[in-house]
Amino acid sequence: MGRKRGRDIDGWLILDKPLGPTSTDMVNKLRWAFDAKKAGHGGTLDPLASGVLPIAFGKATRTIPYIMDATKRYRFTLTFGESRTTDDLEGEVLATSPNRPTDDQIRAVLPALTGNVMQVPPVFSALRVGGERAYDMARAGRPPELPPRPARIDSITLVERPDANTAVFDVQSGKGVYMRSLARDIALACGTVGHISVLRRTKCGPFDLSHALTIDQISLDKSTQTVDNADALPAPLLDAATALVDIPALAVTDAEGRMLVWGQSIDPADLVHPLPASSQGEDHLWRAMIGEHVLGLCHVRHGRLRAARMLENHEFFGEHDVDYRRTPHGTDF
């Protein structure tokens, strides 16, 4: 296999994704602009959605799963009176209704849609059915019957009513929640039909719009590069560990850090800075830190502290030419 082309660049760029392109389009565009060897994103936004799209480079891609699992916030406009094949503006009209709910009627249905609920995904989604993408089946005239899936919706707030036909909502939710489905379900619960006409993600894990850059704020024109600025990045990046700031920190010594990096386990009782007794369960993650520097994530498994996902390797400690195949336990670098 040939060596990946590009530079070793590490960090997060938080993009304010514009309407139109897919999330993958934006990753590819920015990977090219940064000449990065490795890039990925922290949660898909539909082409007709805008807002916070975290894009990871290098080491930061190791933290993508924690951003995907993180809490997210959205603001969307629900247009009443038309249901559509895609549950957004892009689709064809399926049904119409003259009913327009009042503010009180809308607020009355929101509690039943909040919490741990079952949600039917949009037919036009990337879910696989028998190896095929649901949206491919729908476009081929074979829309699949998608079963309800568990969804966690923390809060739904009616923000404003621009007019009788529309309502604006602010939503906080867990991973994998479809705002198009939620908009559809709000309308149905109100005795009418509807679809999303505007969708914007305002927060994704620790990242919000205050961190985000528009595509116009990123230097994409490589023709302006000179010998003097060839290594300059098109935009500044956030540290790779920024994605982990919501995870509790655990101070470790150099010796303990080396053990974790090498894939060796540690008896929690032997730690210089012990774990709280109430936090030694296997569902707890910790940021292993030496001073202010994050080595990576660790957790307790089978009674011992082990690496879960490391950002650093032996080179952080000034060690070189290490053969990990000869270590007692491999780890993920």
UniProtKB/Swiss-Prot annotation:
Reaction(s) this enzyme catalyzes, per UniProt: uridine(55) in tRNA = pseudouridine(55) in tRNA
Keyword tRNA processing belongs to the record: yes
Keyword Manganese tagged: no
GO biological process: mRNA pseudouridine synthesis; tRNA pseudouridine synthesis
Annotated disulfide bonds: none
Keywords: Isomerase, tRNA processing
Pfam families tied to this protein: TruB_C_2, TruB_N
Molecular-function GO terms, alphabetical: RNA binding; tRNA pseudouridine(55) synthase activity
Top-rank EC class of the record's enzyme: isomerase
EC number(s) from the headed UniProt entry: 5.4.99.25
Protein family per UniProt: Belongs to the pseudouridine synthase TruB family. Type 1 subfamily.
Function of the protein: Responsible for synthesis of pseudouridine from uracil-55 in the psi GC loop of transfer RNAs.
Cross-referenced HAMAP family: TruB_bact
Protein name, UniProt field: tRNA pseudouridine synthase B
Source species taxonomy: Bacteria, Pseudomonadati, Pseudomonadota, Alphaproteobacteria, Acetobacterales
